[in-house]
């Protein structure tokens, strides 16, 4: 296939070919060649429909079908020469098709515009990426459930402001991420369902006078229905924006978890040990084992956020219907999708392979006066104090323990009673971290029984 000096697909009204700079800024084949399989699938469905409705002959449709299969095989084998003079994947495919089958190739674009063609191609590609994201999220959720089930009763500190707050369990913390990524899964499925309408047959913007069957092409391409308004169909990039929005929310969750894994795997915490398979070393410091996968997830999230913002900026000022600005939609989505899928896979691998250090978790669980709230609750429940009074008494005891360099359970009964005379020996029963987590039996709480129930619920949902 040879480069063309002028575009034979639209050049009839032009006296000269485009300037080299115009050709460079106008061409998108450098990136939209990723849509080749989707473009050919859409063209095959369109040709079959044109034959079924009598717009083209069966013999032309068959020639087009066979020719498109040849083009696809050339692309997949790396034997296809892409031309910047032909601008985009649509014209590159059609030009090569003409070289293979001749005149029937010119009938393929009947009742179709590149406007509905690219919208269809892009939707098909984004739909595939939603499916890939669903698979990645399911794998990650199952890895998290495995961690949660194994550590349903392993105590660890819960944090607010990255300061010790209350004891929780490892399983409870893992289930928090199950809930987050579970919402991401729901958003993926919801957005995929909403976008599954076919733009094909909308033509440039107003539809077509040919007797086409848009329901036929929609069904052939796996869409639920054709779009209801041709003008909207070619103007719409909501599906791409929603993809990026869903990806951004999920990426934010990935980044938060990645940050915790970086902290937890440090020598100062030792909460988790990341496997060698998801760590790297240092070129100068032999002792180093760096959580680079987690750090790179955290960084790649910025690219996903940037893509979301960039496409919003592209679309914000465009009148209906198509404007060439919309050519700038794809690179953002391609890059975000690549990084999202990679981040999901890396996180799933880290979670699956990592080891939670139960002893380190338990040692940290009781530090920082983590059972102070349990003491305040005991004062309310047993002594009948108003919670604000109980809060004040407990704060005084924390200050006393801090001044002595000890934890709350290390205070003597006399010292306890110095803050409130009615405190009894029974108070020590609520100051242990195991008792604390076991007492949190409210629905969704950190008690091991609650954690196991939530694990079972999610396993059933994902079965």
UniProtKB/Swiss-Prot annotation:
Q: Which reaction does it catalyse?
A: 2-(N(omega)-L-arginino)succinate = fumarate + L-arginine
Asked if Amino-acid biosynthesis is a keyword of the record, the answer is yes
Q: What residue stretch is flagged as signal peptide?
A: none
Name its cellular compartments: Cytoplasm
Q: Does the keyword Lyase apply?
A: yes
Q: Which Gene3D superfamilies match?
A: Fumarase/aspartase (C-terminal domain), Fumarase/aspartase (Central domain), Fumarase/aspartase (N-terminal domain)
**PROSITE patterns assigned to the protein according to its UniProt record, in alphabetical order:** FUMARATE_LYASES
One GO biological process this protein is involved in is: arginine biosynthetic process via ornithine
Top-level taxon of origin: Bacteria
Q: Which UniProt keywords apply?
A: Amino-acid biosynthesis, Arginine biosynthesis, Cytoplasm, Lyase
Q: Name one Pfam family in it.
A: Lyase_1
Instruction: Check the record and name the CDD domains matching this protein.
Output: Argininosuccinate_lyase (cd01359)
Give the top-level enzyme category: lyase
Q: Name one GO molecular function term.
A: argininosuccinate lyase activity
Alphabetical list of InterPro entries matching this protein: Arg_succ_lyase_C, Argininosuccinate_lyase, Fumarase/histidase_N, Fumarate_lyase_CS, Fumarate_lyase_fam, Fumarate_lyase_N, L-Aspartase-like
Name the pathway it acts in. Amino-acid biosynthesis; L-arginine biosynthesis; L-arginine from L-ornithine and carbamoyl phosphate: step 3/3
Q: What is its EC number?
A: 4.3.2.1
Entry GO CC = cytosol
Q: Which family does it belong to?
A: Belongs to the lyase 1 family. Argininosuccinate lyase subfamily.
HAMAP family from the xrefs?
Arg_succ_lyase
Q: Which PANTHER family match?
A: ARGININOSUCCINATE LYASE
Q: Which named protein is this?
A: Argininosuccinate lyase
Q: Which organism is it from?
A: Ruegeria pomeroyi (strain ATCC 700808 / DSM 15171 / DSS-3) (Silicibacter pomeroyi)
């Amino acid at each position: 296939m040879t480069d063309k000096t002028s575009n034979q697909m639209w050049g009839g009204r032009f006296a000269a070919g485009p300037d080299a700079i115009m050709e460079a800024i106008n061409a998108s084949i450098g990136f939209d060649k990723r849509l080749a399989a989707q473009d050919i699938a859409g063209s095959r469905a369109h040709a079959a429909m044109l034959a079924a409705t009598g717009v083209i002959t069966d013999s032309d449709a068959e020639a087009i079908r066979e020719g498109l299969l040849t083009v696809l095989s050339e692309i997949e084998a790396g034997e296809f020469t892409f031309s910047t003079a032909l601008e985009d994947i649509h014209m590159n495919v059609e030009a090569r098709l003409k070289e293979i089958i001749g005149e029937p190739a010119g009938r393929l674009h009947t009742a179709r515009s590149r406007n509905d063609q690219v919208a269809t191609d892009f939707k098909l590609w984004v739909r595939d990426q939603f499916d890939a994201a669903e698979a990645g999220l399911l794998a990650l959720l199952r890895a998290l459930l495995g961690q949660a089930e194994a550590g349903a009763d392993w105590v660890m500190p819960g944090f607010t402001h990255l300061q010790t707050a209350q004891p929780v369990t490892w399983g409870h913390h893992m289930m928090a991420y199950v809930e987050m990524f579970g919402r991401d899964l729901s958003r993926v499925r919801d957005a995929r369902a909403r976008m599954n309408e076919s733009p094909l047959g909308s033509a440039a913007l107003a539809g077509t006078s040919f007797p086409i069957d848009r329901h036929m092409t929609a069904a052939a391409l796996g869409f639920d229905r054709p779009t209801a308004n041709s003008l909207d169909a070619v103007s719409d990039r909501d599906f791409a924006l929603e993809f990026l929005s869903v990806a951004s929310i999920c990426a934010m969750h990935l980044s938060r978890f990645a940050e915790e894994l970086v902290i937890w795997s440090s020598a100062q915490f030792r909460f988790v040990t990341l496997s060698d398979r998801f760590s790297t070393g240092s070129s100068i410091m032999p002792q180093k084992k760096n959580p680079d996968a987690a750090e790179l997830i955290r960084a790649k999230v910025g690219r996903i956020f940037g893509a979301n913002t960039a496409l919003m900026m592209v679309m914000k000022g465009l009148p209906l219907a198509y404007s060439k600005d919309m050519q700038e939609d794809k690179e953002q989505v391609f890059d975000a999708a690549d990084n999202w899928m990679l981040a999901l896979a890396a996180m799933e691998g880290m979670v699956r392979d990592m080891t939670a250090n139960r002893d380190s978790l338990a040692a940290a669980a009781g530090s920082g006066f983590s059972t102070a709230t349990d003491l305040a609750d005991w004062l309310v429940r047993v002594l009948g104090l108003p919670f604000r009074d109980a809060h004040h008494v407990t704060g005084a005891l924390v200050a006393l323990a801090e001044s002595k360099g000890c934890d709350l359970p290390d205070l003597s009964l006399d010292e306890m009673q110095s803050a409130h005379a009615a405190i009894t020996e029974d108070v020590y029963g609520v100051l242990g971290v195991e008792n604390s987590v076991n007492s949190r039996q409210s629905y969704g709480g950190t008690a091991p029984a609650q954690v196991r129930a939530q694990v079972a619920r999610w396993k059933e949902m994902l079965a």
